[in-house]
């Protein structure tokens, strides 16, 4: 008969999410809060932020910082956006120094700071504006390009993003043309 081991349960969960998990997810798989606290004290688990943990036994990957950002907002999932979304979809030469995350307007954390290197944006995203890259929620190309245009990223990068989105199939040609006209009319191109 196999005995229950809280760490093994956490480790399996963390492996599925590039080493990162939330306290809420740990409880959902049967790990008690007291067991999680003991794992932190013993160094088996690292506390990244309030309710957010990393298993040092799980290998880090390119995706670990993104998963950390997405899981950080408790009770909901953030959406990778702006320059981060451009980078993940490989649209333009955007190379953001920070991870951009959009969360709903009503979800404004007062006491909790986001993980280091995460920039928060607040918007109520329509489900049709959210896609996926490597299983991570990411704003779709048209929404992303509108967001970076509103943030004044620069016309050359915006043009390149539109062209790349068309070539890679993230934007239909007719949608790319409409987006270009919209941004020209708004003075962004």
PLM segments and residue spans:
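Short gly/ser-rich loop at a beta-strand->alpha-helix junction or flexible surface loop bordering the NTP-binding
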Residues: 2-189
